[in-house]
Amino acid sequence: MSSASPLARCCDEATPSAGPRAAQPPYHGPVTSMVAHDAAAGVTGEGAGPPVRRAPARTYQVRTYGCQMNVHDSERLAGLLEAAGYRRATDGSEADVVVFNTCAVRENADNRLYGNLSHLAPRKRANPDMQIAVGGCLAQKDRDAVLRRAPWVDVVFGTHNIGSLPTLLERARHNKVAQVEIAEALQQFPSSLPSSRESAYAAWVSISVGCNNSCTFCIVPSLRGREVDRSPADILAEVRSLVNDGVLEVTLLGQNVNAYGVSFADPALPRNRGAFAELLRACGDIDGLERVRFTSPHPAEFTDDVIEAMAQTRNVCPALHMPLQSGSDRILRAMRRSYRAERYLGIIERVRAAIPHAAITTDLIVGFPGETEEDFAATLDVVRRARFAAAFTFQYSKRPGTPAAQLDGQLPKAVVQERYERLIALQEQISLEANRALVGQAVEVLVATGEGRKDTVTARMSGRARDGRLVHFTAGQPRVRPGDVITTKVTEAAPHHLIADAGVLTHRRTRAGDAHTAGQPGRAVGLGMPGVGLPVSAAKPGGCR
């Protein structure tokens, strides 16, 4: 996967929320008084006299950096703001409130955030009523440092208290003083908050928050906290509700989904190491749910019961994203990755034995401190043997506060870049060979919007196959809509996508397509990313596994 891959660039680019979203049920959590909502909308109660002209509702924009966890949380931030009376800003307009949901995994995430904050400073000076809020992992890490570097910011909040955003914005407006509120522990599951979803046809469902691993390169556990699992009943209730709204595909999110069941928030629920496999099977019993994905598992805890559930559950997609990080056992030890290369390859072998057509993708880090040419050669060897459908490759980024930042042997940039390019070239050749093997085959595609960067030029539409591959196809008829399901035949292959110019073989209209036509958003949504291919905008894998 080249450096232009969505997962490699996700911390460099913010994904703004835009467009209308599905209505959500009333929210009764910690937000500003709903009187603000009524006043903003110009509504007066019975007996209040003649209608009084009110100021228009304040508009907002959420800019998202980083992983699927952040995309999920940003949908909750948008839902909270709309429940408090804010209105989503239209594309191209200047929002009254700009919220940055930040990433702290790589150094260029910091640089990009503070660069964008600097660009907003003139707007803030010209319009003091505009508000800027910074949340997410970088805010949790930097805390008061955000205001030192960007004193025009109005609100700083962390990963554990996103439900406080509307209250903090109102308090900052009233007191004319910046508000900083960083909670040290999870206050409530983000999934319990109102949501303004990014898609009519695909949804994120968080099954846990936090991580109990201690990878030396990763700062996420110190920012998200130790793992806390939602109850299966709550998760399945959310999935059923989404399906009732027309959603066809859900992605189950966790920093380490294999560990689900050992840290339930409800003390009445016993530890259950088989809980994740059971959850997958339970999703298979939900009528109308066509696709289930999950991200991401940890190789050290990947068990055969999960492989069996994947193979035997009708709607679990034949796709697995399992981070490798390095093919060198010596580097894996230095990373505190509690598995070795042969164990990883053994898991892949068992997955392919049970699901021969599974598309397996991974994450790789190049240039970890102390990595020798021999270590890097071991990574290349594992990549050749594993035959990944795609590999999302990152150059090691030194993060203050992580053990790896203190290690000797930090590599020169030129060495890391040269190895990175060699790895990219190898993986792209493997990806191309795998995709060429699909030419002539029929694929089922869940039609998306915005996944193809040149769709308007080529007159193609785009979507994802069941295995996550990106497919650009010629519809040949105007009735195909985002959210519909089609089958088509692959006519051409590239490393990052398939082309299907043979026309649509079958077309099934869906309620999700109806919802999209009725006014759902027209922006890019990764269908259970990480998938295989290059959508316009996508999120990187959730933290570090």
UniProtKB/Swiss-Prot annotation:
Residue ranges occupied by any MTTase N-terminal domain in the UniProt entry: 58-174
Residues that hold [4Fe-4S] cluster 1 according to the record: 67, 103, 137
Domain of life: Bacteria
Coiled-coil regions, chain positions: none
InterPro entries referenced in this protein's UniProt entry, alphabetically: Elp3/MiaA/NifB-like_rSAM (IPR006638), Methylthiotransferase (IPR005839), Methylthiotransferase_CS (IPR020612), Methylthiotransferase_N (IPR013848), Methylthiotransferase_N_sf (IPR038135), MiaB_methiolase (IPR006463), rSAM (IPR007197), rSAM_horseshoe (IPR023404)
Domain Radical SAM core: 197-433
Subcellular location: Cytoplasm
Spans annotated as Disordered: 1-32
Annotated [4Fe-4S] cluster 2 binding sites: 211, 215, 218
Nucleotidyltransferase recorded as keyword: no
Major localization listed first in the record, in broad terms: cytoplasm
GO CC terms: cytosol
SUPFAM superfamilies recorded: Radical SAM enzymes
GO biological process: tRNA methylthiolation
First-level EC class: transferase
EC number, as in UniProt: 2.8.4.3
Keyword Iron in record: yes
Reaction it catalyzes: N(6)-dimethylallyladenosine(37) in tRNA + (sulfur carrier)-SH + AH2 + 2 S-adenosyl-L-methionine = 2-methylsulfanyl-N(6)-dimethylallyladenosine(37) in tRNA + (sulfur carrier)-H + 5'-deoxyadenosine + L-methionine + A + S-adenosyl-L-homocysteine + 2 H(+)
Cofactor note as given: Binds 2 [4Fe-4S] clusters. One cluster is coordinated with 3 cysteines and an exchangeable S-adenosyl-L-methionine.
Keywords attached to this entry: 4Fe-4S, Cytoplasm, Iron, Iron-sulfur, Metal-binding, S-adenosyl-L-methionine, Transferase, tRNA processing
Cofactor(s) needed by this chain: [4Fe-4S] cluster
Family label: Belongs to the methylthiotransferase family. MiaB subfamily.
Subunit structure: Monomer.
Protein function: Catalyzes the methylthiolation of N6-(dimethylallyl)adenosine (i(6)A), leading to the formation of 2-methylthio-N6-(dimethylallyl)adenosine (ms(2)i(6)A) at position 37 in tRNAs that read codons beginning with uridine.
Identification of the protein by name: tRNA-2-methylthio-N(6)-dimethylallyladenosine synthase
Taxonomic lineage from the root: Bacteria, Bacillati, Actinomycetota, Actinomycetes, Mycobacteriales
